[in-house]
Amino acid sequence: MKKSTLTFLLFFPILLMAQSDKKVTADFLQSFADAFNAHDVKAIMSHMTDECVFEASAGPDIDGEKFTGQEQVKKAFAYIFAIFPDAHWGNAQHFISDNRGLSEWIFTGTKSDGTKVEVTGCDVFTFKDGKIAIKNSYRKNRMTTK
């Protein structure tokens, strides 16, 4: 057996353990929230896995509308910013337990027709390798005002 093959076989399990040992912190989730408030889709996506899933709070399915993979999720987030040019998620609080997390927030935004929205909501996260694998969003449904 070649020395390089033996070295690989000996250290590959250690490499796998190191990769799966990445922990998400509250600072990481705050950085994610800051990227949303900056409407910085590139920064947002850097927090998510390549095979990420975004389950929107509204849509035709029981779990809202589901977007899978970096491209679909990126387009979904860009669409939110187009609908709500002043979208903001404030008063964020983050909670983490193992590979799951929760962020509570107050969403405010104004649609292009002048409709104002202010609702509480939360994101339920599943983490993988130190990034967000699933972002499942929930928010209150409230009468809107102009």
Name what the model sees in each region.
Residues 16-46, 70:
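Short, low-complexity N-terminal intrinsically disordered segments enriched in polar/charged residues
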Residues 46-92:
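A solvent-exposed, acidic/Ser-Thr-rich amphipathic alpha-helical stretch
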Residues 83, 108-118:
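Short, cysteine-centered beta-strand-loop-beta hairpins and adjacent loop/turn segments enriched
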Residues 98-107:
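A short hydrophobic beta-strand element
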Residues 120-143:
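Short beta-strand edge/turn micro-motifs at domain boundaries
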Residues 88-89, 104, 117-123:
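Short, surface-exposed coil-to-beta transition loops
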Residues 53, 115, 131-133:
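Residue-level signal for well-ordered, solvent-exposed loop/turn and beta-edge residues enriched
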Residues 1-21:
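Bacterial Sec-dependent N-terminal signal peptides
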